[in-house]
Swiss-Prot record:
Alphabetically ordered keywords of this record: Ribonucleoprotein, Ribosomal protein, RNA-binding, rRNA-binding
Gene Ontology CC entries for this record: ribonucleoprotein complex; ribosome
UniProt protein name: Small ribosomal subunit protein uS8
Record Gene3D superfamilies: 3.30.1370.30, 3.30.1490.10
A single BP term in Gene Ontology: translation
Protein's organism: Teredinibacter turnerae (strain ATCC 39867 / T7901)
Length: 130
């Protein structure tokens, strides 16, 4: 059976692993998942990630905790296969008054909402993180 929304699956795996206190989570890999993991690492929401290539490519994300609680409080999918969400450079959302981030897929790559505003590009809003 094929997976309908691999990004939603990735976000759900991260949420579930953090709820039970796991140190890392493994999932099937793709270019978009690696890009999202890279943004999460750069912004400090996860400790790091490791991608293996080959016939069965896997992505392992090392989760991050602060005083025993997950660093990621909310991880929500915005654009989904049934209802894509696009925003221009002036319409990009701010998450929790700028405390969180929105991950955006643009023509210049996957980046945060702040980086997209600075680059002057809009795109598909993949998810929000707080």
């Amino acid at each position: 059976m094929s997976m309908q929304d691999p990004i939603a699956d990735m976000l759900t795996r991260i949420r579930n692993a953090q709820m039970v206190g796991k140190t890392s989570v493994t999932m099937p890999s793709s270019k978009l998942k690696k890009s999202v993991a890279n943004v999460l690492t750069e912004e400090g929401y996860v400790a790091g990630f490791n991608a293996t290539d080959g016939v069965k490519a896997e992505l392992t994300i090392d989760l991050k905790y602060f005083e025993g609680k997950p660093v990621i409080a909310e991880l929500d999918r915005i654009s989904r296969p049934g209802l894509r969400a696009y925003a221009g450079k002036d319409e990009l959302p701010t998450v929790r008054g700028g405390l969180g981030i929105a991950i955006v897929s643009t023509s210049k790559g996957v980046m945060t909402d702040r980086a997209a505003r600075a680059a002057g590009v809009g795109g598909e809003i993949i998810c929000t993180v707080f």
